[in-house]
Amino acid sequence: MTTISAALPSGRLLEDSKAFLKKIGINVKEPAKRELISYENGYAFYFPRAFDVPVYVENGVDIGICGSDVVLERNNEVYIPLELPFGKCRMSIILPENREISFQNMEGYKIATKYPEITKNFFSEKGLKVKILKLNGAVELAAKTGIADAIVDIVDTGNTIKANNLKEAYKIMDISAVLLVNRITQKTKFDFINDLINKAKNYKNGVKGH
């Protein structure tokens, strides 16, 4: 039996990814302590950081799951057959709660973010030049300490930004978990991939129907 390799994101999407795969007949085995790979019923499961999932899939891992934000930021060569019915959130421009300004007037702003490419492209498309500060986490701190004029980050409930006296000012895009497929796997394991996509679509449509 051919082994199928799958990269699943460690972090907030992992449990939903496992639940989704179980619904379409793929049981994910948790890795042993300190292990990064597990094996179950012809599958090899890898558990990289979400930001690295597209890199693994582009470079030989058969399938993966991560957020659409990660795919857009990394811009790897992967096949994305469909959005998945979880991981729903949005990416937004976030400001101190007492600041009133339109994004059209943010020329020259310092923007802190974990998503420099998406941020740069958004402001470039609006014809605005901004300075981007690439951070790896807790970007709210950059706005609170004043090293950035605004931040671009993921918003789910909005509780974190409210707790830090910030506000969601402008939505840049909606985000969802997505299924990734290696470009070569798409051709060499066509029957498996086609079956997987059909099962995923059927499950997604069933979720929408409820």
From Swiss-Prot:
Lacks the C-terminal regulatory region which is replaced by HisZ. Heteromultimer composed of HisG and HisZ subunits. Coiled coil: none annotated. It holds the Pfam family HisG. CDD domains: PBP2_HisGs (cd13595). Keywords: Amino-acid biosynthesis, ATP-binding, Cytoplasm, Glycosyltransferase, Histidine biosynthesis, Nucleotide-binding, Transferase. This is ATP phosphoribosyltransferase. Its EC number is 2.4.2.17. GO terms for cellular component: cytoplasm. Catalyzes the condensation of ATP and 5-phosphoribose 1-diphosphate to form N'-(5'-phosphoribosyl)-ATP (PR-ATP). Has a crucial role in the pathway because the rate of histidine biosynthesis seems to be controlled primarily by regulation of HisG enzymatic activity. PANTHER family: ATP PHOSPHORIBOSYLTRANSFERASE, ATP PHOSPHORIBOSYLTRANSFERASE ATP-PRTASE. Belongs to the ATP phosphoribosyltransferase family. Short subfamily. Pathway: Amino-acid biosynthesis; L-histidine biosynthesis; L-histidine from 5-phospho-alpha-D-ribose 1-diphosphate: step 1/9. NCBIfam families: hisG. One of its GO terms (biological process) is L-histidine biosynthetic process. It catalyses: 1-(5-phospho-beta-D-ribosyl)-ATP + diphosphate = 5-phospho-alpha-D-ribose 1-diphosphate + ATP. It comes from Petrotoga mobilis (strain DSM 10674 / SJ95). The gene is hisG.
